[in-house]
């Protein structure tokens, strides 16, 4: 999920917002699912295997609360730039976007959901995230 609707449209299209060799194939199968497929092993066509159909299980959306409420695992990955003003400007990490995202997760996550923080953050940030999550789940 992302708050940027244009980015989500790209993830839901054939033209992903990032280029990584082979990524479109992986995303397409997970996002769109597949039909059952019969493949032949070896060169002599003697051994055939049927790969079962696959339901879609990768979704891109701007609806944060709905997505988080349905998720068993939530990966939080937001931009964490260097602060540009105030105490620590030019050196400290700006955690405003991270704290906002974690607050949204805390308000919507179901009990027992696993929250994984994937942004580049300073030591001790996990403690802050835990506090936000515990306050939001009350």
Language-model features: locations:
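Rossmann-like NAD(P)(H) cofactor-binding subdomain of soluble oxidoreductases
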Residues: 82-138
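Conserved N-terminal Rossmann-fold NAD(P) cofactor-binding segment
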Residues: 3-73, 77-92, 135-136
């Amino acid at each position: 999920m992302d708050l940027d609707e244009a980015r989500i449209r790209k993830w839901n299209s054939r033209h992903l917002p990032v280029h990584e060799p082979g990524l479109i194939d992986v995303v397409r199968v997970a996002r769109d699912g597949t039909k059952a497929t019969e493949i032949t092993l070896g060169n002599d066509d003697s051994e055939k295997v049927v790969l079962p159909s696959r339901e879609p299980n990768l979704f891109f959306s701007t609806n944060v609360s709905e997505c988080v409420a349905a998720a068993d695992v939530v990966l939080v990955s937001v931009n964490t730039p260097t602060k540009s003003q105030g105490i620590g400007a030019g050196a400290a990490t700006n955690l405003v976007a991270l704290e906002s995202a974690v607050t949204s997760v805390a308000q919507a996550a179901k009990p027992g959901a696993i929250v994984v923080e994937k942004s580049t953050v300073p030591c001790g940030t996990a403690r802050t995230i835990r506090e936000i999550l515990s306050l939001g789940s009350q």
